[in-house]
Amino acid sequence: PSNPLLKCTNVIEISKIAQRYNIPLITDDTIGSNLNINSLDYSDIVFTSLTKIFSGSGDILAGSLILNPRSKWIDKFKKALNEIDIPKLSDNDLVYLEKCSRDIEFRVINQNSNCLKLKKKLENHHAIKTVFHPENCPNFNSILKRNGGYGCLLSFELKGNIQKTKKFYNALELSKGPSLGTQFSLICPYVLLAHYNELEWAN
């Protein structure tokens, strides 16, 4: 899914098109999580931000890529990776990430459940205009694993003007910051953070 509107691309159909035109398909499963969705079957490379769901704390800067062993480009990918200088993580970061990996399945299950409960609560609230969440997205469901869920992220739009939105945001007793996938609830005014310099133009 995309961030922040959770729009879901039809990865299966795009994969067919990519194969037809001999183009490698690269996807990012950071928001969906490979514990929930099966994107590797349809991708040649899958990127993941280890800063987000994997670490669960948002205090480490790291990422990973998985090469599909069945990809026709696997040898070219390996050669390219061996030819570039990729910065290495420190030993402490690697040890920390290994510790994070021990309970990631438990955390993802909890995040899936908590986010879905919040989604259902918000979509029936009189002050909420729209809730964005992948539960009803056919494209997401087409690659959903048997025991997978819908992830840890949702977005919503409030009814009313900007002043009401500011008052609501400031009153929330939650951690606030630009990340996702933490073990604690985190809220972020995405439009303000991502498009601050464009707001006047957009209005």
Please annotate each region the language model reported.
Residues 130-202:
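Conserved C-terminal alpha-helix-loop-beta "cap" of PLP-dependent enzymes
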